[in-house]
Structure formats: C-alpha cells, structure tokens
C-alpha cells in the first residue's frame, strides 16, 4: 500500500513539474519505472493542491492545466487601451491573449458542458487567480464588467452570505485594496 502511495506521489510530482515548465524549457519526463496504471491513476485524480503558475506560458493556456486536472491557475493581467491582456510582462495588444478569450470563455464553455462544474466529478470550485500587474483600481472595474455576463458561474457573497459557484475568483498583485473591502 505504501509503495502504491509513494508511486502516486512521485508521478504527481513529475506531472506537476512538467505542467509548470514554461514554453521553450526542457520537458520533464516521467520516470520509465512508473507504470502506465500509476500514471493513469495520478492523472485521473483532481489535484486540488496543484497550481499552474504563469499558466499562460503553456502551449494551451488553461486547457493544459485542466487536462492534468489541476484545480488552480494564475493569469497575470495588464490593462492596455481598455482591454485586459494576459502576460507576465507588458504585452503588445493581441486579441489572442485577452483574459476573456484565454480564460473566461473556455472556462464557461467547460462548465456548461459539464453540468455546471469545471470537473464533472467534483463539487469543489476551481480557483482562478488573477495577478493585477498595474492599475489595480481601473483593472478591477473592467474585470467586473467583463465577468458580469458570467457571474452565475462564479462564487459570490451577497448581503454577507456566501454562494458557491463553479469558479472561485481571487486577486493578487496590484489589487484595489481600498475598494475591495467595501464590495459585497
């Protein structure tokens, strides 16, 4: 039993490392001694503690993390000319890397396809972390506006009461520290 747990741990660690390698870096290979069955077991479990840091560096942002069944992704956002772009450094405007196109629309499509859940076999919310790179107050206003059509899919607080949704959204970085505590 302990050997099986150790094998699952090693496989999960290898998968996590492979998922967190930025584009262009060497791919981490799962050890040859790991059996196909162990890989299958590890990849079928939802990795609630796995976090796809700088997720937009993946070949398929969001989708790679979901295929490895990670339960949290991070997207760094920049506000440029009234649009939210996903990038670690300030990007050139490009519709292919907008927050809505890379994260909101694909997440909502998946939730709709899975009966209101990111993972059909889990009742726990998926975590979407947004790191505001600059202009926190202005960015937050636009984020709220962009997320409004999708609000039914997100966890929320209404009059002090928590309502669970398929996705728990949270902010880091240059977040609007003064206005957020006043939000409901």
Task: Place the predicted regions along the sequence by residue.
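Positively charged n-region of N-terminal signal peptides that target proteins for export
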Residues: 2-5
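Bacterial N-terminal signal peptides
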Residues: 7-16
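Phosphate-group recognition and catalysis centered on beta-loop-alpha active-site segments
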Residues: 19-184
């Amino acid at each position: 039993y302990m050997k099986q747990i150790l094998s699952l741990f090693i496989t999960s660690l290898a998968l996590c490392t492979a998922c967190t390698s930025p584009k262009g870096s060497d791919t981490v290979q799962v050890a040859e001694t790991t059996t196909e069955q162990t890989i299958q077991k590890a990849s079928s479990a939802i990795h609630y503690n796995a976090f796809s840091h700088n997720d937009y560096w993946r070949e398929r942002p969001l989708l790679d993390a979901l295929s490895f069944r990670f339960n949290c992704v991070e997207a760094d956002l920049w506000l440029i000319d009234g649009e939210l772009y996903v990038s670690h450094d300030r990007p050139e405007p490009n519709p292919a890397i907008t927050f809505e196109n890379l994260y909101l629309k694909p997440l909502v499509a998946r939730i709709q396809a899975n009966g209101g859940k990111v993972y059909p076999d889990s009742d726990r919310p998926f975590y979407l972390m947004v790191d505001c790179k600059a202009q926190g107050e202005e960015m937050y206003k636009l984020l709220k506006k962009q997320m409004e059509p999708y609000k039914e899919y997100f966890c929320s607080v209404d009059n002090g009461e928590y309502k669970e949704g398929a996705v728990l959204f949270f902010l880091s970085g240059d977040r609007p520290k003064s206005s957020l505590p006043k939000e409901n």
